[in-house]
């Protein structure tokens, strides 16, 4: 075997096996899974709220949704992570993985809001009109008719 291959194998054995550094990788996978699960849940919640703001008839809510979506989608996620960690949560004693989950949840919320908005807009206006003609109010029409059909398109 070539000497450089022996050196690589020896270095790998020393670093990962004898010095137990594989345990760091395993714990890192656990943190990654925690951050991912929390960020996905938070992103879906934020995305749903922002999608409703973007679809609202209220100009103020639409403006908030548009500003949020434009700013978050227009800045790199690492920049957002650094601002949230070093500026917003600088004086708060909170675990680092929670801050990362919040940052990635906020970031994914902007993208999820557009997916949900597109799913809701993909439902024919006739469905909303049918619900309204049956005597349902706007909330009932959205929750009983539009959103169940939109979920098929969203997922």
Predicted regions and their residues:
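Transmembrane alpha-helices and adjacent helix-loop boundaries
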Residues: 1-155
